[in-house]
Swiss-Prot record:
Gene Ontology cellular component list: cytosol
Gene: aplK
EC number: 2.7.1.233
Source organism of this protein record: Pectobacterium atrosepticum (strain SCRI 1043 / ATCC BAA-672) (Erwinia carotovora subsp. atroseptica)
Keywords recorded for this protein, A-Z: ATP-binding, Carbohydrate metabolism, Kinase, Nucleotide-binding, Transferase
Catalytic activity: apulose + ATP = apulose 4-phosphate + ADP + H(+)
Gene Ontology terms: biological process: glycerol catabolic process
Listed name of the protein: Apulose kinase
Length: 496
C-alpha cells in the first residue's frame, strides 16, 4: 500500500524548497537548496534560470528520497513573483537570465509614465502602480536588449514567462506553456476585471501576445510531468497547482474570507488580505488576484521591497554575513539610540511607491556602535510592515484585530514581539516555515478531490502561537514616529 502525496515546490529568491504532503495535509518530508542572485550592474538583479531548475530537481529528489512507500500523485508549484525570463520556444534554451523582481532596469521608463494618462490606465486595468517591480516594464527593456528580440517575439519564436510558467515548462518537458491567474495578475499586462491579457497594455509595453502563456486557474490541470530525471517522480504525473508565493501563503494560512490579514517575511515582505471585488485607488496598496480555484478571488496587498535583504545588506556592510550572528549583535544593543535605517536600496515599495527614494542610515553620532546599526536594520523590518498594516487599516476603515505571520524572520521571537508591540495587535505565528508550499499543495489537493471546500482546508490543523502585545510602550510608539521622519528624509529630492 502506497501513501499518495503531492510534491509541492516553493521556488523563492534565495531557496528552492520541496515538500511532500499527504491527504491529511501533513508534511511527510522536505528539503531545500540555496540559490544565488547576481548584480552584474547597479540596479540589476538576475538569476540563472537553469540553475533554478537544477535546484528544484535537487530539492525534490532529496525530499522524495526520505519517503517510504509513497507515490507522487500530483505536483504543485509556488513561486517568487514578478521575476521573468525569455526562452527559445523551439529549444527551450533561456535567452535571458531570470530578471528578478528586485531588478530596477526599467526605472527611467517607469518614471516617464508617472502621473500620465497611461499610468492611470495601467492601474485601472491591473490594480498595480507603475513601478519597475512588475514584469511589463522589465520585458520592454529585455526585448530591446535581446538581439532581434522584438522581431523574434513577433514571429512567436520566443516564450515569455514568470517562474511558475518556466517550472511548468520544465516539469512537462516543454509540453505545457501556461501560468495561473495570480502570477498573470502580477505582470501588469493582465486585465484583472476581464481575466485576460490586455491588448492595450501589451501595445503600450510592446509585448506581442503570441509570446505569452495561456492563463488557467491556480487549482487546475496544468499539464503532466515528462521524464525529469528526478528519482521518485514518474512521468505523466499531473501538475495540479500553480500560484505566486504570497498568494499561496495566504491560502496556506487558511485565510479564504475577508477580514483577516497575513504578512509573509522574506527577502521582501508582503501583507495581503482577501477582498470580494477589486478595490482600486487604495492609496499605497495594490489590488490583485489572490487565486482562482473555480472561483476568482481578489486580494489587497502591500509589497515591501527590502526587509530580509535590507537586514542582510547591513550585515555585509558590517562584515557580519551570518544572519544569526547579525541578529545576536543587534540584540546586544539595548535600544537603537535614535539610529534608523531606511532600506530604500532600490526605491520604496508599499505604501510609498517611490522609485527615487534612496537608502538612508541616520541619527549617527560618535557613540554609535555596530550593534546599534545592526539593531536599526532589524527594527526596519517591523517598521515597514507597520507602515503597510496601518495603510490597510485606513483603507478598511476598521481596526484589524490581528496579524497572521509566516516566513523565515518569524522565527525571531524578539522581532515578532517588537512587531506586536508596534502594532498593538496580537500576532498569530505559524510555526510551519513552509506555508507557501503548503498553500500550493492545498490547491493541488483540491484539484485532486482531496478536499472539496475551502472551509475544509481552513479547518486543517495548524501549529500556531499567539504573541500578545505588551502594554502600550510609549518609547516604541515614539520611535515609530521618528521612523516616519526618517522615511520622509529618504524621499527628499536633491535640488537640481
Amino acid at each position: 500500500m502506497y501513501t499518495p502525496v503531492i510534491l509541492a515546490i516553493d521556488e523563492g529568491t534565495t531557496n528552492a524548497k520541496a515538500i511532500a504532503v499527504d491527504e491529511r495535509g501533513r508534511i511527510l518530508a522536505k528539503a531545500a537548496v540555496a540559490l544565488q542572485v547576481t548584480h552584474p550592474q547597479p540596479g540589476r538583479s538576475e538569476q540563472d534560470a537553469m540553475a533554478i531548475w537544477r535546484a528544484v530537481c535537487q530539492a525534490a529528489e532529496v525530499c522524495l528520497s526520505s519517503l517510504h512507500r509513497a507515490q507522487v500523485v500530483g505536483v504543485a508549484i509556488s513561486n517568487q513573483r514578478e521575476s521573468v525570463l525569455i526562452w527559445d520556444r523551439q529549444t527551450g534554451k533561456p535567452m535571458t537570465p531570470l530578471v528578478s523582481w528586485q531588478d530596477r532596469r526599467a526605472e527611467k521608463f517607469c518614471q516617464a509614465l508617472q502621473g500620465s494618462a497611461e499610468a492611470r490606465l495601467i492601474e485601472s486595468r491591473t490594480g498595480l502602480q507603475v513601478d519597475p517591480l512588475f514584469p511589463a516594464a522589465k520585458l520592454h527593456a529585455m526585448l530591446a536588449e535581446l538581439p532581434n528580440g522584438v522581431a523574434r517575439a513577433m514571429q512567436g519564436e520566443l516564450c515569455i514567462g514568470t517562474v511558475d510558467c518556466w517550472l511548468n515548462w520544465q516539469f512537462s518537458g516543454g509540453r505545457a506553456f501556461s501560468t495561473d491567474y495570480s502570477n498573470a495578475a502580477r505582470t501588469q499586462l493582465f486585465n484583472i476585471h476581464r481575466g485576460c491579457w490586455d491588448e492595450d497594455l501589451l501595445a503600450l509595453f510592446g509585448i506581442p501576445s503570441v509570446c505569452l502563456p495561456a492563463v488557467t486557474p491556480s487549482s487546475a490541470l496544468h499539464g503532466h510531468t515528462g521524464v525529469t530525471g528526478i528519482s521518485g517522480l514518474a512521468a505523466c504525473v499531473p501538475i495540479v497547482a500553480l500560484i505566486g508565493d504570497s498568494h499561496a501563503a495566504l491560502y496556506g494560512q487558511g485565510i479564504t474570507q475577508s477580514g483577516e490579514i497575513k504578512a509573509t517575511y522574506g527577502t521582501g515582505s508582503s501583507l495581503m488580505t482577501t477582498i470580494n471585488t477589486p478595490h482600486l485607488h487604495a492609496t499605497g496598496l495594490s489590488t490583485t488576484i489572490a487565486w482562482h480555484d473555480g472561483e476568482l478571488r481578489y486580494a489587497l496587498e502591500g509589497n515591501i521591497t527590502h526587509t530580509g535583504s535590507g537586514f542582510a545588506w547591513i550585515g555585509q556592510m558590517l562584515g557580519v554575513p551570518s544572519v544569526t550572528q547579525l541578529t545576536e549583535l543587534a540584540l546586544s544593543a539595548e535600544s537603537n539610540q535614535g539610529v534608523f535605517f531606511v532600506p530604500a536600496l532600490s526605491g520604496l515599495g508599499a505604501p510609498y511607491w517611490d522609485v527615487q527614494a534612496r537608502g538612508l542610515l541616520c541619527g549617527l553620532c560618535d557613540a554609535t556602535t555596530p550593534a546599534i546599526i545592526a539593531r536599526a536594520g532589524l527594527e526596519a523590518i517591523a517598521y515597514q510592515v507597520a507602515d503597510v498594516f496601518f495603510a490597510m487599516e485606513q483603507v478598511s476603515q476598521a481596526a484589524l484585530p490581528a496579524l497572521r505571520v509566516d516566513g523565515g524572520a518569524t522565527q525571531n521571537r524578539w522581532l515578532m514581539q517588537f512587531q506586536a508591540d508596534l502594532l498593538q495587535r496580537p500576532l498569530i505565528r505559524n510555526h510551519n516555515a513552509e506555508v507557501s508550499a503548503l498553500g500550493a499543495a492545498y490547491l493541488g489537493g483540491k484539484m485532486l478531490g482531496w478536499w472539496e471546500h475551502n472551509e475544509q482546508i481552513a479547518a486543517l490543523p495548524r501549529e500556531v502561537e499567539v504573541i500578545e502585545p505588551s502594554a502600550t510602550n510609549h518609547a516604541i510608539l515614539e520611535s515609530y514616529q521618528q521612523w516616519r521622519t526618517a522615511v520622509a528624509r529618504a524621499r527628499l529630492r536633491p535640488e537640481a
